[in-house]
Amino acid sequence: MAAMRAHARRRHPHALMSRAAGLPRLSWFAGLTWFAGGSTGAGCAAHPALAGLTAGARCPAYAAISASTARPAATAGTTPATGASGSARPTDAAGMADLARPGVVATHAVRTLGTTGSRAIGLCPCQPLDCPRSPQATLNLGSMGRSLDGPQWRRARVRLCGRWWRRSNTTRGASPRPPSTCRGDNVSMIELEVHQADVTKLELDAITNAANTRLRHAGGVAAAIARAGGPELQRESTEKAPIGLGEAVETTAGDMPARYVIHAATMELGGPTSGEIITAATAATLRKADELGCRSLALVAFGTGVGGFPLDDAARLMVGAVRRHRPGSLQRVVFAVHGDAAERAFSAAIQAGEDTARR
């Protein structure tokens, strides 16, 4: 491994891999080609990951590359790759090879297809390998590997992941830079998705119910969940009621495909709700999902039905609560919504959070 890092510094000082929006990054990715048995020709064109990005047909994440441009990196001894006008070339399908040239750093993100989520990979001049991080930081190396094919890359990733986790979660050898210089240290590792879907039919570890404090599921989504779950769900709810505003409790899911239903109290029986209650209820739901060992969770739009809370505001508050959450077992949150307006609201809230994280 030491030889790999030395090789990376000697032959590929410019090739740095990271996750967009401050997600896990590896500063010595350049040596991966040598470690995986690939050749190292001029530049970094032989990297398995870059080859996967260049060959769009092989890389399932290629279609989700966001439009942006490549910019020169401030790397000593390298010359930026530029177009005829002297400006940096765009990272479109024809210009993806520029990612392999010395001195070029990509500013795009490659997102997992089918999500609006926060998991992404890219190239970046940061070196947060030396920054202490939380144990959850390794979650997205697996997501990254699923976006790139090739058995050699997968074998190398496993070795790479173990080494990076040990290095990045100890204070030994840590960089003297303050943690705040590592973009995204406070960004949640949870993958976010938005779907127009019937929450009672989702095959996830847990789904949520926007409930009242008495856990009487009489109207809206709560009534639909109670009907789908069967009488056992209401019986368990009655046993655990009442609960406080912003609190969450779990019951079994009854006849639904999920394992649990997490009931979050967003209002008194028949009463209005507020932004503070929605934020607290979302945070309590996420904590409860971690307590139950859930990896996947469906959230409904809290407070926007009987509670009458504005949809855009609810989306912003709920997405913000998920991004601030430091997950234990939770890896994936699906916002299960009804209607185009709700889908647009939650998608916009997720995108706004990603844009803020990149800045």
UniProtKB/Swiss-Prot annotation:
Residues 73-93 are annotated as: Disordered. It comes from the Bacteria. This is Uncharacterized protein Rv1899c. Residues 179-354 form the Macro domain. One of its GO terms (cellular component) is extracellular region. Residues 73-88 have a biased composition (Low complexity). It comes from Mycobacterium tuberculosis (strain ATCC 25618 / H37Rv). InterPro entries: Macro_dom (IPR002589), Macro_dom-like (IPR043472).
